[in-house]
Regions:
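Carbohydrate-active catalytic/glycan-binding domains of CAZyme proteins
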Residues: 1-210
């Protein structure tokens, strides 16, 4: 497709050249980064529980594979770039393990991996100098209950799962995310807030706005 508005043509399932699919990580919530060094696909779902059919699946966390230029042939084996529930203990991800919602961006010399954590209200991020990671956990960008902002320990409103990503617009950076309305997990409202990228590349947690 030549424009983001579509219409899209189905190219095929993401598989190895022989048609097989790596049996590590849950193929869920994908994100793509394409640059001169290659095409990178990030994916993953890392719950503290197992759905039927997932009992024996190895789920280290957020996974990454390289794709051929056809964008659906896997040319590298999966590697874990951010620790999930099963592997976070003893790492910087221990309090905020990867859950789902992979999002990848590059600003300046840094690659930013944004994800929804096991805490079920926040978008966290890790940083790496390479798209292949691993991404060093750096903190929370936004909580849809403002938990953690300026020391808040209690939610300021109904909160729940969060998805989103970073965008640069006219030299400024924003986090797009969603909050929950009407006190229900399925009433979700898209939101955007400006973020500040500090000299060392880190992003302080922001207060959610209306």
């Amino acid at each position: 497709c030549d424009t983001p508005a579509g219409k899209y043509e189905f190219l095929g399932y993401v598989t190895r050249e022989d048609g097989s699919v790596p049996n590590i990580g849950r193929w869920f919530d994908p994100a793509i980064l394409s640059e001169e060094s290659g095409n990178y696909l990030y994916y993953g779902f890392s719950p503290s529980f197992r759905f039927p059919g997932m009992e024996t699946l190895e789920i280290p966390g957020a996974m990454m594979v390289k794709l051929a230029d056809d964008m659906h042939t896997i040319i590298s084996e999966p590697v874990c770039v951010a620790n999930g529930y099963d592997t976070a203990k003893g790492t910087d991800y221990e309090e905020h393990p990867f859950f789902e919602a992979s999002s990848i961006r590059k600003f300046g010399e840094w690659y930013y991996f944004v994800y929804s954590s096991q805490q079920m209200h926040e978008l966290c991020y890790g940083m790496s100098k390479t798209p292949e990671g691993p991404f060093e956990y750096k903190g929370v960008i936004v909580s849809n209950g403002d938990i953690g902002y300026e020391g808040n320990e209690l939610a300021t409103n109904y909160y729940g799962n969060n998805h989103g990503g970073l965008v640069e617009i006219n030299g400024k950076h924003y986090i797009f995310w969603h909050r929950h309305t009407h006190g229900r997990a399925f009433s979700r409202q898209g939101c955007a807030d400006k973020v500040e990228i500090l000299a060392d590349g880190t992003i302080p947690q922001i207060e959610m706005t209306s």
